[in-house]
């Protein structure tokens, strides 16, 4: 008889059962509420979900009003709205309209929201969180339809009064000025107060004092030209644009005003007025320092047909501000950031931009009343401005690469023509570009091609193969192809190029150039013994015995070169192997390398000989060898100076110089942070001065020697200007952090990444070349 008892079988008790009185519980009500409403608020007015923004706002507002039962629940809702405003600021007008719409059923929401954002505004100012304060003020401005007249004026006046008393620029002063100027157009567009334009004029007059004082401190270089230093600084330009807008009666028709969809309903709202707290601002010494100035980056002003707002139009600054805020504050999700950017036109008024994907050659045929601005050009210009427009990027360059890649994946037919125009423009301008701009652009271009099967219309550039080998256009092609080889395999890159351009590929690498592995080499036996001694960790005395052999003594090869080449061979299987060799044989390697400066130069020279056909590997290894103090920074500069002058036109040289000087800067910063030890500061300063002067004097001498060779002089001058502008005077607040100590570095770097013997390397050598590793293998 079966023992089965059907549904009457008792449930088995577990450790978490009745015996212990434990039951998994659901989260508290506020956590559940946040989870329910977060998605609705985040995707508010998103064109992917609802093509009609008014319907979406109405739907979400009804949902929120049902949830808003008490002050605690309303606070949770406002926290979600503020978070969304921070990461997707382009939706601020829609979020403000959502609050007003929800308050029709729950008036307490509006009262709480006005008080909440007003309090957050002053709190963030006191905490020096200027971006957050800018967003909070804009939220209040876009809610002004439901605020009492004059409520917002003190929020502007307090900042304007503070900066009007300043006689020199400061970090806090520039940020106050930005908050005021960039929010004034929104204030005028959203406010129904009859005196709003007079108030805007008063604020601009107050700001004029500070703007005039800061002009004398502005020093800028043009990232798109080595000849033209005339550049418009962002805040100075924004002020000029608003002054010009005054002549047009402050008209900003492109700013979205979604609250107008509900004007007939909003007449029933009782306006509120949040209390303005007594506020005093006390800046720290860091906030009183001289600010960093940023040039307004323009690319599309060089085309015959203008597809972006003119620099004199405040729309240029408004679109750039919104785009850059999305780029810099949605960085944790580049796919979503790319989606918001490609939908940029949706968040401004209808017909602000030409239809997506409209060919440039068709723009002149449009009706004169129709816009010729292309949203895709605006976002590409904004991303490239962040990548190319300043010496120090906010994030690693690979983030901006990946963002452009995602934009192109989302809307390839729309963005591909824009990318093509930019690439051709930069190629044409290559002889005028500063070194850093050229290097970063080539880095992006090669990375971008690697994600789209390396397809490019190379045939357009075939005639330029006949140019001099050092001509910037030919260098542009050659170094792009070199970077592609790092991201793929030789045969694949070769197949993607027309026959005429394959001469730029160079010789196909078959692996490291370890000359002693050939059995016919006179030192084959000794090199094998050295490798075995290193592998078995034999004492230094036994190595010395091997080096005393007659074959080595009679050879032209020095002991330093032989030992280092054998060590390189041991570490050539992967990057992990290289780090292990440096760590385990550190004392042995230092014994040979640090005998003299000449020995260190030999170590560097042997490394580049070992990676003869893959010099980026050598740059990557040198970065780690500097961490382990196997060589000094001076030895790298000395080695560079002794090479053929054509080396200054190679991108691996640019990366090597950048890596070397970043190490100097990091050491200086680390020594400055250790205030108790003044000797460290003096030593770091002395090292920086010696190395910088060594390179600068050598470059000037080489320029003088090669004055008759136009393109050799061109590359030497580019490097000279690059070093002078980036490293001649290192500011404490712009120096990059030093690498971790050797012990920590080695533990972090134990990754089993294979170093391809042909041409594919998973990890690239410098900050500007992190595309393969940090992009999480975009191609795959």
Curated annotation (Swiss-Prot):
List, in alphabetical order, the GO biological process terms annotated in this UniProt record.
mRNA export from nucleus; mRNA processing; nuclear polyadenylation-dependent CUT catabolic process; nuclear-transcribed mRNA catabolic process, nonsense-mediated decay; RNA splicing
GO cellular component, alphabetical, reads:
cytosol; nuclear cap binding complex; nucleus; perinuclear region of cytoplasm
Q: Which residues form a coiled coil?
A: none
Q: Where is the MIF4G domain?
A: 34-249
Family annotation (Pfam families): MIF4G, MIF4G_like, MIF4G_like_2
This protein's source sits in the domain of life called: Eukaryota
Which SMART domains does the record match to this protein? MIF4G (SM00543)
Show the segment(s) annotated as Disordered: 1-25, 738-780
Tell me the compartments it is located in. Answer: Cytoplasm, Perinuclear region; Nucleus
Q: Which residues carry this modification: Phosphoserine?
A: 29
Keyword Nucleotide-binding appears in the UniProt entry = no
Keywords, comma-separated and alphabetical: Cytoplasm, mRNA processing, mRNA splicing, mRNA transport, Nucleus, Phosphoprotein, RNA-binding, Transport
Q: Name one GO molecular function term.
A: RNA cap binding
Major location (coarse)? cytoplasm
Q: What does this protein do?
A: Component of the CBC complex, which binds cotranscriptionally to the 5'-cap of pre-mRNAs and is involved in maturation, export and degradation of nuclear mRNAs.
Q: Record's family?
A: Belongs to the NCBP1 family.
The record's listing under PANTHER family reads: CAP BINDING PROTEIN (PTHR12412), NUCLEAR CAP-BINDING PROTEIN SUBUNIT 1 (PTHR12412:SF2)
Self-association state and partner proteins as the record states: Component of the nuclear cap-binding complex (CBC), a heterodimer composed of cbc1 and cbc2 that interacts with capped RNAs.
Protein's recorded name: Nuclear cap-binding protein subunit 1
Question: Native species of this protein?
Answer: Schizosaccharomyces pombe (strain 972 / ATCC 24843) (Fission yeast)
């Amino acid at each position: 008889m079966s023992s089965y008892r059907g549904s009457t079988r008792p449930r088995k008790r577990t450790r978490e059962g009745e015996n212990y009185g434990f039951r998994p519980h659901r989260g508290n009500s506020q956590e559940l509420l946040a989870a329910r409403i977060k998605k609705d608020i985040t995707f508010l007015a998103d064109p992917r979900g609802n093509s009609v923004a008014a319907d979406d706002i109405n739907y979400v507002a009804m949902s929120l009003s049902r949830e808003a039962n008490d002050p605690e629940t309303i606070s949770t809702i406002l926290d979600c709205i503020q978070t969304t405003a921070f990461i997707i600021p382009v939706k601020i007008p829609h979020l403000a309209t959502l609050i007003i719409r929800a308050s029709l059923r729950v008036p307490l929401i509006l009262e709480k929201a006005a008080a909440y954002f007003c309090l957050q505004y002053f709190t963030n100012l006191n905490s020096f969180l200027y971006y957050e304060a800018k967003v909070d003020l804009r939220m209040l401005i876009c809610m002004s339809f439901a605020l009492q007249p004059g409520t917002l004026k003190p929020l502007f006046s307090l900042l304007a009064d503070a900066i009007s008393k300043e006689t020199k620029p400061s970090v806090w002063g520039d940020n106050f000025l930005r908050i005021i100027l960039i929010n004034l157009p929104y204030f005028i567009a959203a406010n129904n107060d009859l005196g709003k334009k007079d108030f805007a004029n008063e604020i601009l007059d107050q700001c004029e004092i500070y703007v005039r004082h800061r002009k004398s401190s502005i020093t800028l270089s043009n990232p798109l030209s080595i000849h033209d230093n005339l550049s418009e600084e962002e805040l100075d330009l924004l002020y000029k644009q608003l002054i010009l807008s005054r002549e047009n009666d402050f008209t900003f028709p492109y700013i979205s005003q979604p609250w107008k969809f509900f004007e007939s309903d909003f007449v029933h709202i009782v306006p509120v007025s949040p209390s303005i707290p007594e506020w005093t601002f006390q800046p720290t010494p860091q906030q009183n320092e001289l600010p960093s100035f940023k040039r307004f980056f323009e690319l599309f002003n060089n085309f015959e047909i203008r597809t972006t707002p003119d620099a004199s139009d405040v729309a240029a600054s408004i679109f750039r501000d919104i785009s850059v805020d999305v780029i810099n504050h949605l960085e944790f999700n580049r796919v979503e950031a790319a989606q918001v950017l490609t939908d940029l036109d949706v968040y401004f008024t209808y017909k602000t931009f030409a239809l997506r994907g409209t060919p440039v050659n068709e723009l002149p045929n449009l009706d004169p009343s129709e816009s010729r601005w292309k949203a895709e050009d605006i976002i590409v210009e904004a991303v490239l401005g962040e990548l190319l427009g300043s010496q120090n990027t906010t994030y690693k360059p690979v983030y901006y690469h990946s963002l452009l890649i995602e934009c192109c994946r989302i809307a390839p037919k729309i963005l591909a023509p824009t990318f093509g125009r930019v690439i051709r423009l930069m190629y044409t301008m290559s002889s005028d570009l500063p070194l850093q701009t050229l290097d970063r652009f080539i880095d992006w271009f090669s990375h971008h091609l690697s994600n789209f099967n390396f397809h490019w219309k190379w045939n357009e550039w075939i005639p330029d193969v006949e140019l001099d080998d050092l001509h910037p256009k030919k260098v542009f092609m050659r170094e792009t192809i070199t970077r592609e080889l790092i991201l793929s395999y030789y045969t694949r890159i070769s197949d993607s190029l027309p026959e005429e351009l394959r001469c730029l590929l160079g010789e196909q690498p078959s692996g490291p150039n370890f000359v002693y592995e050939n059995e016919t080499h006179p030192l084959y036996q000794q090199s094998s013994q050295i490798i075995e001694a290193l592998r078995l960790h034999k004492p230094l005395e036994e190595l010395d015995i091997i080096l005393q052999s007659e074959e080595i003594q009679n050879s032209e090869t020095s002991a330093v070169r032989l030992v280092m080449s054998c060590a390189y061979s041991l570490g050539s299987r992967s990057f992990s192997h290289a780090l292990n060799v440096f760590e385990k044989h550190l004392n042995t390697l230092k014994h040979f390398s640090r005998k003299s400066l000449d020995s260190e130069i030999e170590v560097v020279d042997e490394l580049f000989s070992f990676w003869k056909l893959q010099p980026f590997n050598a740059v990557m290894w040198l970065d780690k060898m500097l961490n382990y103090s196997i060589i000094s920074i001076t030895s790298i500069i000395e080695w560079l100076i002794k090479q053929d002058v054509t080396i200054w036109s190679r991108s691996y040289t640019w990366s090597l110089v950048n890596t070397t000087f970043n190490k100097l800067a990091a050491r200086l910063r680390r020594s400055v942070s250790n205030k108790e030890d003044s000797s460290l500061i003096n030593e770091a300063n002395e090292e920086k001065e010696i190395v910088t002067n060594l390179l600068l004097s050598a470059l000037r001498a080489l320029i003088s020697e090669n004055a008759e060779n136009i393109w050799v002089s061109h590359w030497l001058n580019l490097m000279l200007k690059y070093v002078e502008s980036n490293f001649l005077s290192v500011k404490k607040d712009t120096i990059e952090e030093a690498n971790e100590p050797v012990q920590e570095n080695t533990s972090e770097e134990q990754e089993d990444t294979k170093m391809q013997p042909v041409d594919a390397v998973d990890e690239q050598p410098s900050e500007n070349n992190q595309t393969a590793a940090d992009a999480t293998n975009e191609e795959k």
